[in-house]
Amino acid sequence: MVYLATDKQTYADLSITETANNEQFLFSLFSKTETKEGKALMLNWIMYPLSDLGEIRKRQEAIVWDALPELLLNEEELDFIEYYLAYRDQIREAHILLSCATVIDRLVRYDSTRYVICRGVKLVVHLLHCLKEWATELPQGAPQLMKESAAMIDNILHGSELEEVLEQTSDEEKRLSNFVIDKFDYLFRCTRLLSLKELLSVIYLLDVCRTPHRVAKEKSFCCIPVMVQTMHFSVEGFVHT
């Protein structure tokens, strides 16, 4: 990525994130994303503009695309996944004897940590299935940015332990055993944590594209202005004293 050099004074002059007179600033137009991480990514796009015309066009084409999907998970589910992945308690490799030995204890005693792990595992499994389905069914005419995201999903899943998770959970309604939950938990929170972070970034990218698309529709904004390499510009009847 090649970024445009900017400074604090430029941000202030353009009223990017704040104004001197409590007026509406630019970011407020596009800050109503559906997720917290999407909002952070949107701010990053605005605060660090690109100077590469090709990359700018990719973003524009993705934003204007009328087939942008609904977010694959809702905000609460995504927040819980983020919380679960950041949760550091009881990270250990799965052992079938330990999993079996703790079954009765888990049935008779409520364990908040176990709740986080069980729900987190189920939501991550659901996330993997949603992303796999989206990447597989992406139409040929999709914008390049969406194709790149789908390719990233395929590269991460193909031939990895995460692909094995998809195969083992083809029926998402099927109850997972304690041992399988423990095995998946170690995989998600330790072995393939960074891969899951990359996969989550696709959801936030969709959020960032959907938000200006929605704003542009509501306010009749132009999504893709005509951009040229060179132009002739002249001013007449202007006097400077």
Where are these regions (language model features)?
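Extended alpha-helical scaffold/assembly modules in large eukaryotic proteins
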Residues: 174-178, 182
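Long amphipathic alpha-helical segments
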Residues: 134-141, 197, 215-224
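Conserved NTPase motor "head" modules and their coupling/switch loops across ABC/AAA+ ATPases, GTPases
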Residues: 204-241
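Phosphate-/polyanion-interacting regions in eukaryotic proteins
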Residues: 181-204
